[in-house]
Amino acid sequence: MESNNGIILRVAEANSTDPGMSRVRLDESSRRLLDAEIGDVVEIEKVRKTVGRVYRARPEDENKGIVRIDSVMRNNCGASIGDKVKVRKVRTEIAKKVTLAPIIRKDQRLKFGEGIEEYVQRALIRRPMLEQDNISVPGLTLAGQTGLLFKVVKTLPSKVPVEIGEETKIEIREEPASEVLEEVSRISYEDIGGLSEQLGKIREMIELPLKHPELFERLGITPPKGVILYGPPGTGKTLIARAVANESGANFLSINGPEIMSKYYGQSEQKLREIFSKAEETAPSIIFIDEIDSIAPKREEVQGEVERRVVAQLLTLMDGMKERGHVIVIGATNRIDAIDPALRRPGRFDREIEIGVPDRNGRKEILMIHTRNMPLGMSEEEKNKFLEEMADYTYGFVGADLAALVRESAMNALRRYLPEIDLDKPIPTEILEKMVVTEDDFKNALKSIEPSSLREVMVEVPNVHWDDIGGLEDVKREIKETVELPLLKPDVFKRLGIRPSKGFLLYGPPGVGKTLLAKAVATESNANFISIKGPEVLSKWVGESEKAIREIFKKAKQVAPAIVFLDEIDSIAPRRGTTSDSGVTERIVNQLLTSLDGIEVMNGVVVIGATNRPDIMDPALLRAGRFDKLIYIPPPDKEARLSILKVHTKNMPLAPDVDLNDIAQRTEGYVGADLENLCREAGMNAYRENPDATSVSQKNFLDALKTIRPSVDEEVIKFYRTLSETMSKSVSERRKQLQDQGLYL
């Protein structure tokens, strides 16, 4: 919308690469209305004015009438996300002098090293600004903040838009600007990565009632009173609550669950009443209750009277909130099922939003945020590629783990530069400028940072691709359609109205590549890979084995997309009524059945079982809806054996006389594991012949054939072929045929 001498646009959050850079993202139509080119300077006005440089908007922003600016610029002009601002093109002058003051607490003092003015002048070159703006200087950070902010105290010339030039003199005052730290170290939406969907839901639930209660009045509905954020520790629940409070301009009151509890009668309830009373007096307010499960547990399960009284007090306070819409309660917990059910109903906590473990793209966004002010010594394109690689390595990491990883990487870099630094003197600017954090610093940090959400259940990061598996082309195609497609393209299934398979069973002789196939699926579909090994699950304590299965499926849901791999599933899920182990395996089978049936709500979780003996498995597991597909992995034929040999010799220096075709011909009955062993033994034969050998000859392979024998003979192949034919029949036909053959089902 055009206004005299400017246009009116709606404020949206900045791109993840923009915070602290004074960038203004405008679409082509807005630039045309302003007669502005990329690189021009525009003024943004709401309560106050600020300036920034024009950058190209995302293609999806075209004709939406929005302007993307970061939280510093929003704070400078007094606007929030969703507000309308006036944007106009302005001319800047090169500043002769700019005076800056750090924005820190009044009782703090910063001691800058020599040459700080030159460093700041170079870091801010061509940066547009106005007097009284807050600006961020790349590379300068304060502990606990994403970046150190400065107040533009004075510019010469004054009261006009200026930019820093080569000749601009920078003066930095050591005394802080007259700001409170809470106001400026504000956590904004740009500081939250990988949670855009959840953030959208929370903003709709919280920001709208706080900023525009008239919308709810017009529709004749009452705004929500509360939201519970739940998920593993470190995923960003508290961060979201603070960001929402900051961006909505609401007063933020925090209650840390355990701190509210008191041994004196009635004191815990009194503390709660005081906080709710203060929230209503200073509305609009957000009351944030961290670890809400510690003060509002299920009343029937607690021994103490205090907890029961606190829960009752919280219920009456939430029911009695007068300023509905002006006071919102946000609870955070990682134990949602431990909260009293009376709180978990509409009218109290209206919504429950899961803040889960971030996926690969989410991890990249979080890493972008935490490395925003970090000197990585690489171009934007290289940084982008590197952070994508780091996102691949960090399966199962939550936001707090990624922050710890970045911090540890910086400490690794610091340790490299410490010998050059005299800690008793100010650090010279040239040392500060040459400090960079390298890829090796990150990779070394990865060795010491363990993902917190998966410490109980280790999620493997497979690195097996389809090309690493020789042969089995039909099986690979079937698995891709069954597993990979639903994980990579869920929209196809939604469009065609198909429900993806929940799981499938791979069966065949030992060594044919069942585990390898499962790992390849996880790698190619970018899914987490959780392996359940039978003996690790079994426990002598009643209920512990079932609990282990439940926890694994719960973790799979948290780190989805995930593949749960049950290796040797026949050892933990044999046919019920055939074992004498006091019912442990029967209970495990029952738990598996209920877990598999519960996968309807587990989007992005696929279960793969592997076994050599599907005939002794419990038949209830083999029906559609649990293991939807039974896939037979046959021993490799000649073509498949050749393909497997090529895979295992691709990094092996072969002599010219090596004929893999001939070796494939000679290895009838060899499975994938045998062929891998054969190649290894051939390499060892080459070493035994000559420790300085540079290649492996045909003779080495033929000698290896004398010691490495096939795992599968004609009798085994016949057994599995019969089994494969039987497994493809109906349950009644299958049972009869297996009983006739002396097997059972």
From Swiss-Prot:
<dbReference type="InterPro" id="IPR029067">
    <property type="entry name" value="CDC48_domain_2-like_sf"/>
</dbReference>
<dbReference type="Pfam" id="PF02359">
    <property type="entry name" value="CDC48_N"/>
</dbReference>
<dbReference type="Pfam" id="PF02933">
    <property type="entry name" value="CDC48_2"/>
</dbReference>
<keyword id="KW-0677">Repeat</keyword>
<dbReference type="InterPro" id="IPR003960">
    <property type="entry name" value="ATPase_AAA_CS"/>
</dbReference>
<comment type="similarity">
    <text>Belongs to the AAA ATPase family. CDC48 subfamily.</text>
</comment>
<dbReference type="GO" id="GO:0005524">
    <property type="term" value="F:ATP binding"/>
</dbReference>
<feature type="binding site">
    <location>
        <begin position="508"/>
        <end position="515"/>
    </location>
    <ligand>
        <name>ATP</name>
    </ligand>
</feature>
<dbReference type="GO" id="GO:0016887">
    <property type="term" value="F:ATP hydrolysis activity"/>
</dbReference>
<dbReference type="InterPro" id="IPR041569">
    <property type="entry name" value="AAA_lid_3"/>
</dbReference>
<dbReference type="InterPro" id="IPR005938">
    <property type="entry name" value="AAA_ATPase_CDC48"/>
</dbReference>
<keyword id="KW-0547">Nucleotide-binding</keyword>
<dbReference type="InterPro" id="IPR050168">
    <property type="entry name" value="AAA_ATPase_domain"/>
</dbReference>
<protein>
    <recommendedName>
        <fullName>VCP-like ATPase</fullName>
    </recommendedName>
</protein>
<dbReference type="InterPro" id="IPR003338">
    <property type="entry name" value="CDC4_N-term_subdom"/>
</dbReference>
<dbReference type="GO" id="GO:0005737">
    <property type="term" value="C:cytoplasm"/>
</dbReference>
<dbReference type="Pfam" id="PF17862">
    <property type="entry name" value="AAA_lid_3"/>
</dbReference>
<dbReference type="GO" id="GO:0043231">
    <property type="term" value="C:intracellular membrane-bounded organelle"/>
</dbReference>
<dbReference type="InterPro" id="IPR003593">
    <property type="entry name" value="AAA+_ATPase"/>
</dbReference>
<keyword id="KW-0067">ATP-binding</keyword>
<dbReference type="InterPro" id="IPR003959">
    <property type="entry name" value="ATPase_AAA_core"/>
</dbReference>
<comment type="subunit">
    <text>Homohexamer. Forms a ring-shaped particle.</text>
</comment>
<dbReference type="InterPro" id="IPR009010">
    <property type="entry name" value="Asp_de-COase-like_dom_sf"/>
</dbReference>
<feature type="binding site">
    <location>
        <begin position="231"/>
        <end position="238"/>
    </location>
    <ligand>
        <name>ATP</name>
    </ligand>
</feature>
<dbReference type="InterPro" id="IPR027417">
    <property type="entry name" value="P-loop_NTPase"/>
</dbReference>
<dbReference type="InterPro" id="IPR004201">
    <property type="entry name" value="Cdc48_dom2"/>
</dbReference>
<dbReference type="Pfam" id="PF00004">
    <property type="entry name" value="AAA"/>
</dbReference>
